[in-house]
Design a protein with these regions (language model features):
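Alpha/beta catalytic cores of nucleotide-metabolism and tRNA/nucleoside-modifying enzymes
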Residues: 6, 10, 16, 22, ...
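Alpha/beta enzyme core
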Residues: 29, 78-112, 116-195, 209, ...
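Active-site beta-loop-alpha junctions enriched in small/polar residues
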Residues: 15-17, 40-42, 70-72, 97-99, ...
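Hydrophobic faces of well-ordered beta-strands that scaffold small-molecule active sites
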Residues: 10-14, 35-37, 65-69, 92, ...
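N-terminal small/glycine-rich loop or linker at the start of catalytic domains
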Residues: 2-11, 43-64, 98-106, 126-135, ...
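Glycine-rich, positively charged N-terminal anion/phosphate-binding segment
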Residues: 15-90
Length: 334
């Protein structure tokens, strides 16, 4: 990305409410080529909102780190970029893909896919206010009648974007099953900057298929890695032609979960961190016996010691099902 060399071709995409510093560090430790902050409002940055600035917190994790900003006014996006230049990060990412109603209703996120010219002007302003590389995360388009990823990607490249990540669904599709790899291939053919393919990558074969079908330069993994940071190890090995790594046993998975939540509590305090940890914790229940009941348990987490009780329940459920938690093959990822 510009002057940044990535250690791996699989990177961790931004997700509001999930990609805080502890989550990013965990993914980087397991091989994410870069990580990105939760999306940050350009207006809030310009107005100096302290809560928003806290989302930028960087933790040394061995991988390049980007700050993602969102907004629909080019000049404000430029001012916001200037406001964060003082912080420690490696690149600026522009959100042109968020489908959330509260974001698109203001004209930002994936609503920008309706206006390629505005996309270009936003990138131009951001590039003008930073010495760091600028990247863009976008969608296939707004809806079936507005498939604009190619036009938007070309406008962004011309304005100075150093990389484009394409989620292969329209805003109308949200996260419904099925992606369109062809749109990623079309963007790859249309621009010279690196292109990342994004959407429905849950295993190494998904990543290989995306690269094979689209010739993209790398893959961006987001939801698929929640509760499964080892996905980066498996994908990296596959993309680099290396043997598949050994999967973690249940103890390793629970150790990772506990450390992640511990860091959340250390950084935010129990009152803020534990409600946020409920959603993170649910993802670690994937593939386990008794997962439905365990996920309900996740919804009650209030104190850090509640997590220890949950982890004890996880092991008990596996034993009741006749499984050996120490045998990695008995508790595989789905």
């Amino acid at each position: 990305i510009g002057n940044i060399t990535l250690p791996h071709r699989a990177v961790f995409g931004p997700m509001a409410g999930f990609t805080d510093a502890p989550c990013r560090r965990l993914m980087a430790q397991h091989g994410a080529g870069f990580t990105v902050s939760e999306m940050v409002s350009s207006r809030a940055l310009v107005y100096g909102d302290h809560k928003t600035v806290s989302l930028l917190k960087a933790e040394p994790n061995g991988a390049p780190y980007g700050v993602q900003i969102f907004g629909e006014v080019p000049e404000i996006m430029g001012e916001a970029t200037a406001a964060i230049e003082q912080y420690a990060f490696d690149f600026v990412d522009i959100n042109m893909g968020c489908p959330a109603p509260k974001i698109v209703s203001g004209g930002a996120g994936s609503k920008l896919m309706l206006d390629p010219d505005r996309c270009g002007r936003i990138v131009e302003q951001v590039v003008a206010h930073t010495k760091r590389p600028v990247t863009v995360k976008m969608r296939k388009g707004w809806d079936a009648d507005h498939i604009t990823a190619v036009e938007c990607a070309k406008a962004c490249e011309q304005a100075g974007a150093a990389l484009v990540a394409v989620h292969a669904r329209t805003r109308e599709q949200m996260y419904t099953p099925g992606i369109d790899p062809e749109i990623i291939a079309r963007v790859k053919d249309a621009v010279k900057v690196p292109v990342l393919g994004n959407g429905d990558i849950h295993c190494a074969e998904d990543a290989l298929r995306m690269v094979r079908q689209t010739h993209c330069d790398g893959v961006m993994i987001a939801r698929g890695a929640l509760g499964d940071p080892w996905l980066f190890e498996r994908v990296n090995a596959a993309l680099e032609g290396l043997p598949a790594p050994k999967e973690p046993n249940l103890q390793a998975r629970m150790n990772a979960l506990r450390r992640q939540v511990e860091e959340m509590v250390e950084q935010k305090g129990e009152f803020v961190a534990m409600p946020q940890a409920r959603a993170q914790t649910m993802h670690y229940m994937k593939g386990l016996k008794g997962a439905a009941a365990l996920r309900r348990y996740c919804c009650t987490l209030t104190h850090l010691e509640d997590l220890d009780e949950l982890i004890a329940a996880v092991f008990e459920e596996q034993r009741k099902a006749g499984l050996d938690p120490d045998d990695v093959r008995e508790v595989p990822f789905p």
